[in-house]
């Protein structure tokens, strides 16, 4: 069966703050710098991202208990950016690459689906929401005349940047 442990953003924020100055942060930052290379668009936030990654990994370790598998589902907006000072997409991508499926928007079913896909395929899985409402101005600016697609042929694949780095060009904005 599936068990869900619910924790508030405040619990997460408290755990995050307790990791401030953690001696493991510099090693994670170095790993991120090497991984991102030229895609490191915001080097100044890497220490906070490393702090957040350690927070989540320690959270998993401390809450896993007898369970064999763990997934994470978070809420990354609207207060996340203002309170934590960053968006979690890159860290979520890294955790997904390490075999811990992560979804945003409190998408519990999506996280479970990613986990099932991972077990079935023995590979990292990303689910993207298909949104058929590509704005006309975006179509005109980015697609029309450049590619042989009509507006009706286009869609948006979206899921907050949790796509594993092997699936896209790696940079810290981390969007497909």
Language model: regions and residue ranges:
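Hydrophobic alpha/beta core scaffold segments
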Residues: 40-169
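Surface-exposed, flexible loop/turn segments at secondary-structure boundaries
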Residues: 12, 80, 176
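Single conserved hydrophobic/aromatic residue that forms the stacking wall/gate
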Residues: 170-176
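Metallocofactor- and cofactor-centric catalytic cores in central/energy metabolism, strongly enriched
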Residues: 2-71
